[in-house]
Curated annotation (Swiss-Prot):
Disulfide bonds join C100-C108, C226-C244. It comes from Emericella nidulans (strain FGSC A4 / ATCC 38163 / CBS 112.46 / NRRL 194 / M139) (Aspergillus nidulans). Plays a key role in the degradation of rhamnogalacturonan in the cell wall. Involved in degradation of pectin. This is Rhamnogalacturonan acetylesterase. SUPFAM superfamilies: SGNH hydrolase. Gene3D superfamilies: SGNH hydrolase (3.40.50.1110).
Length: 245
């Protein structure tokens, strides 16, 4: 795999010609194992997987992780942004990840770890990150979150949650590419059937094992091909089963 896993983005070699940066949570992260590293063999450029478990769009922003990517990326690089699994909840018992309710410029005031914080909405955090990367000349792709196990109840069921729509809205507002990763993953999971898909989730209904993450990666790549977004230009594989959605 052509993959870069760094503890500090400052260590990234500046000589790399082109890189795909991945920003997300545990469903994408290397250590889980998430799907991010599994696209490496299907692209012609390097992967820098900066996804980290337990993060939301808010906490990734507060920790300076979007800015850290912006500080090292070069014009022509790609950034894939995918969040949503950790963005729900209530600010009344603030876990540091929950976003302000709404889909626009609403704000909420909170105190987290003894520090006052103005909390933005999910679309605002994602849009701000996309605009930050655009200013650096990057090709930005916002991706909807992966589904929880749609076979968990014994019958296939997939209904996109609000963060899927919010991700698409943020992409529209920022003027960047969007793929519905969740829908493509759900479609493939429906075709594979309950027994196979249930085996992908050995611990809980959110995190796939290595085999499942490989399938989720293929779903992402298929979404890229079918959507005709800029990232398609660096794919070395475009032969995915099934029709486009």
């Amino acid at each position: 795999m052509k993959s870069i896993a760094l503890t500090s983005l400052s260590l990234l070699p500046s000589a790399l010609a082109q890189t795909i940066y991945l920003a997300g949570d545990s469903t994408m992260a290397s250590s889980t194992p998430g799907w991010g590293d599994y696209i490496a063999d299907s692209v012609s450029v390097e992967i820098s997987n900066q996804a980290i478990g337990g993060r939301s769009a808010r906490s990734y922003t507060r920790e300076g992780r979007f800015q850290a990517i912006a500080d090292v990326l070069q014009a022509g690089d790609y950034v894939v942004i995918e969040f949503g699994h950790n963005d729900g909840g209530s600010l009344s018992n603030d876990n540091g990840r929950t976003d302000c309710p709404g889909d626009g410029d609403e704000t909420c005031e909170t105190v987290y770890n003894g520090v006052a914080e103005t909390v933005l909405t999910f679309p605002a955090y994602i849009e701000n990150a996309a605009l930050l990367f655009l200013e650096k000349g990057a090709n930005v792709l916002i991706s909807s979150q992966t589904p929880n196990n749609p076979w968990e109840s014994g019958t296939f069921s997939y209904t996109p949650n609000r963060f899927v729509g919010y991700a698409e809205l943020a992409a529209q507002r920022a003027g960047v590419d969007y793929v519905d990763h969740g829908a493509y993953t759900a479609s493939i999971f429906e075709a594979l059937g309950a027994d196979t898909v249930n085996s992908f989730y050995p611990n809980d209904h959110t995190h796939t094992n290595a085999e499942g993450s490989s399938v989720v990666a293929d779903a992402f790549l298929k979404a890229v091909v079918c959507s005709g977004v800029a990232l398609n230009d660096v794919l070395t594989r475009t032969d995915f089963d099934g029709e486009c959605l």
